[in-house]
């Protein structure tokens, strides 16, 4: 997967110094940013021209000490045809030789008012997300009480209906049916809808519903981190379900572990309310309040008290 320079401009604000239609369509294929410090000093042994070239104060100040044709010759090497875009941070002055080198190689030249380290971080974060490998999973992704929840289960069990009820209760839909999952960083999993299904939910017997049109912009969200998973399964009296909540299940998506709660579904159970309770319980545990542990401590105290009174 690649990101075009135009995609970068659409997302992050820059002052465009030089660009052409063909240069804007150049693809950025890596999230690694190059700060050409050694290259400005003439050392090109490990130069990677396919990366974004970012000029900060150090690179710029050295460049300004090089005069005449030497500066242009040096910039021609740094601004190679393979380079997708060159960015100058801190609103630093851009010399005419840099513009000339950009024109020669047909490279977009940008200027930013941001500090170099912050701009580097913003660029890396954006590119890591956009270039991450996507995995498609079946389910409904919701934002419930600020927690990203992936609802899964067998086909026809009522995932979309549960999602619709949760939207009516004030929560936000991210994706229905197909969820594109990607690893945002080493420990964070995120999900987003397929573009064709954005803001849509399918209810058997009703058809496709445009959630944004019916419930407003506050009922949908473009993407969310996946903090927990909920698996809906048909109730089976022969099967043992976790009744205390002290045996959490862990599922793995794209090498990231996510805690999962399994909820049995049968007639008369209000699944959306149970999902809300599961999410609130998850949040409480994240904040250090564990109802299961409290119950177990009370039970232990009661047993000890009964033994002492005998």
From Swiss-Prot:
Enumerate the residue ranges of region (Important for the catalytic mechanism of both phosphorylation and dephosphorylation): 201-210
Q: Where does this protein hold ATP?
A: 153-160
- Please provide the Gene Ontology terms (biological process) for this protein: regulation of carbohydrate metabolic process
Which region ranges are annotated with the description Important for the catalytic mechanism of dephosphorylation? 264-269
Gene3D superfamilies xrefs: HprK N-terminal domain-like, P-loop containing nucleotide triphosphate hydrolases
The GO molecular function terms of this record are: ATP binding; magnesium ion binding; phosphorelay sensor kinase activity; protein serine/threonine kinase activity; protein serine/threonine/tyrosine kinase activity
Report the function annotation for this chain.
Answer: Catalyzes the ATP- as well as the pyrophosphate-dependent phosphorylation of a specific serine residue in HPr, a phosphocarrier protein of the phosphoenolpyruvate-dependent sugar phosphotransferase system (PTS). HprK/P also catalyzes the pyrophosphate-producing, inorganic phosphate-dependent dephosphorylation (phosphorolysis) of seryl-phosphorylated HPr (P-Ser-HPr).
- Please identify the protein, giving its name as recorded: HPr kinase/phosphorylase
